[in-house]
UniProtKB/Swiss-Prot annotation:
It comes from Pseudomonas syringae pv. tomato (strain ATCC BAA-871 / DC3000). This is Glutamine--tRNA ligase. It catalyses: tRNA(Gln) + L-glutamine + ATP = L-glutaminyl-tRNA(Gln) + AMP + diphosphate. GO terms for biological process: glutaminyl-tRNA aminoacylation; glutamyl-tRNA aminoacylation. ATP binds at E51, P52, N53, H57, I58, G59, H60, A61, K62, S63, T247, R277, L278. L-glutamine binds at D83, Y228.
Length: 569
């Protein structure tokens, strides 16, 4: 076998100019450390409480890494608890997908999966206690009336005419709500706090609403369901959560979180902490809008590689490590800001640069016949699977007929062109130097074949008396594997896709070139055995992953994970 000592890696991109802070910060670490040092807590328990009404997205990844990462760092536990209080929008499909995503990211929750619905009986009993204490009442206002009575940020609200119902009447009405006597929306149970509070969340918030809907966990047992604010703090208390960590939009909810804990006989009183959510440009993370993209078939499902969902990133070829590293890189703080998508791409490039085997795949094949190479002869070349890591060697047959990329030959090249041109020379990666002698064209003038000659003295060394600057990738014609390649790009053209012009929709920002499907591509023989989720660097093309759904050994389908360089800067 011939081994090419001059085979060199494709030049790698430099770190993205916005690669994040040199020292990532997490303001929660010293808080947790102080709580342990003071003896306030002997063990840290955090939780990740998604609502099962959609797939997890990249913003959830930050929350997962914060909660699971902190607990792991300090020897604690993290609970996975589904906030399943809105059965009309929830589905077992989402529950299964969320559990798979958490595991895929590399985290394990403590004990069994938990559900807020497990605590419905206790939450109901606590609601009755608030009624008995004169701190909750059944309200008959319509939603429109309730909005009017609530006031505004600059004007106080006013008390509902039903606010002073007797305890006995409220107990009776709440029991009848539970028994299913009333239609959806006819009545709600409210906490009696302060309609003049400057914090809108304390203006008699809803505790329970009527919803005749089948629940995926409790069936038809309930037709009244607690809202998130009444569920989340008490669930934390039941589970002994020490640090209830959420995003900054819940900061104004913390007084209500504490009010419930102060006014109910809960077993412990967790503390809520808030951090800034992940705002990633060129991305949408609204579950409602992500669902709209799926339902209206702008994308091919929740796991479409252009989606910001974790299952989408996984299918595109992102690794769990790259996403964890990205979340660590951007830090955890309380300052809202927008993170450049290039930082996420830098993270996956950095990971795959070290871990992805190299291979060659010709996306737009152009047949090359090497006229002076002996007919019937096949030479076995050896190329390294990786330029630095010890991943072994791969065998590549070389013979008279090969494919190169159509873009690597130009009859009238621009200045500085270093690929193949008439009477010009290039080196085939890991192989010989060839010269373009003749271009064969069809009746329409399209080039269908190149006739070239090779220099047999150039395997592993430069030719005598001349310098060859260009290097192109290639595959053998007979032994190469036909494959499909999907070139994915950012789904949105705008850095802020939700900011549409007047009368426009975020859908108007969809990038029409976000997916290009290439068929008839030719890959080196080793890629024919690729398993779903196998990742590679296609030399000179980018990083690719065998599709988790559609790729099969012998019939590979590859998704472009990321280009070799940031093409958006």
């Amino acid at each position: 076998m011939s081994k090419d000592p001059m085979s060199k890696p494709t030049p790698e991109p430099a770190a993205h100019s916005k690669a994040g802070p040199a020292v990532p910060t997490n303001f929660l670490r010293p808080i947790v450390q102080a709580d342990l040092d003071s003896g306030k807590h002997s063990k840290i328990i955090t939780r990740f409480p998604p609502e099962p009404n959609g797939y997890l997205h990249i913003g959830h990844a930050k929350s997962i890494c914060v909660n699971f990462g902190l607990a792991k760092e300090f020897g604690g536990d993290t609970h996975l608890r589904f906030d399943d209080t809105n059965p009309a929008k929830e589905d077992q499909e989402y529950i299964d997908a969320i559990m798979n995503d958490v595991k895929w990211l590399g985290f394990e929750w403590a004990g069994e999966v938990r559900y807020a619905s497990q605590y419905f009986d206790q939450l109901h009993d606590w609601a009755v206690e608030l009624i008995k204490a004169g701190k909750a009442y059944v309200d008959d206002l319509t939603p429109e009336q309730a909005r009017e009575y609530r006031g505004t940020l600059t004007e106080p609200g006013k008390n509902s005419p039903f606010r002073e119902r007797s305890v006995e009447e409220n107990i009776d009405l709440f029991a009848r709500m539970k028994a299913g006597e009333f239609e959806d929306g006819a009545r709600v149970l409210r906490a009696k706090i302060d309609m003049a509070s400057p914090n809108m969340n304390l203006r008699d918030p809803i505790l329970y609403r009527i919803r005749h809907a089948h629940h995926h966990q409790t069936g038809d047992k309930w037709c009244i369901y607690p809202i998130y604010d009444f569920t989340h703090g008490q669930s934390d208390a039941i589970e002994g959560i020490t640090h209830s960590i959420c995003t900054l939009e819940f900061e104004s909810h913390r007084p209500l979180y504490d009010w419930f804990l102060d006014n109910l006989p809960v077993p412990c009183k967790p503390r809520q902490y808030e951090f800034s959510r992940l705002n990633l440009n060129y991305t949408i993370t609204s579950k409602r809008k992500l669902k709209q993209l799926v339902d209206e078939k702008h994308v091919n499902g929740w796991d479409d590689p252009r989606m910001s969902t974790l299952s989408g990133f996984r299918r595109r070829g992102y690794t769990p490590k790259s996403i964890r590293n990205f979340c660590e890189m951007i830090g955890t703080n309380r300052s809202d800001g927008v993170v450049d998508f290039g930082m996420l791409e830098f993270s996956i490039r950095d990971d795959l640069d070290h871990s992805a085997p190299r291979a060659m795949c010709v996306l737009r094949p152009l047949k090359v016949v090497i006229t002076n190479y002996p007919e019937g002869q096949v030479e076995k070349l050896e190329l390294p699977r990786h330029p630095k890591e010890d991943l072994g060697m791969r065998e590549l047959p070389f013979s008279r007929e090969i494919y190169i990329d159509r873009d690597d030959y130009m009859e009238e090249p621009p200045k500085g062109y270093k690929r193949l041109e008439p009477n010009g020379e290039v080196r085939l990666r890991g192989s010989y130097v060839i010269r373009a002698d003749e271009a064969i064209k069809d009746a329409d003038g399209n080039i269908v074949e190149l006739r070239c000659s090779y220099d047999p003295d150039t395997l592993g060394k430069n030719p005598e008396g001349r310098k060859v600057k260009g290097v192109v990738h290639w595959v053998p014609a007979a032994e190469s594997v036909e494959c499909e390649v999907r070139l994915y790009d950012r789904l949105f053209r705008s850095a802020n896709p939700e900011k549409a012009e007047d009368g426009a929709s975020f859908l108007d920002n969809i990038n029409p070139d976000s997916l290009q499907v290439l068929t008839g591509c030719r890959a080196e023989p080793s890629l024919g055995h690729a398993q779903p989720e196998d990742r590679f660097q296609f030399e000179r093309e980018g990083y690719f992953c065998a599709d988790i759904k559609d790729s099969k050994p012998g019939q590979p389908v590859f998704n472009r994970t990321v280009t070799l360089r940031d093409s958006w800067t």
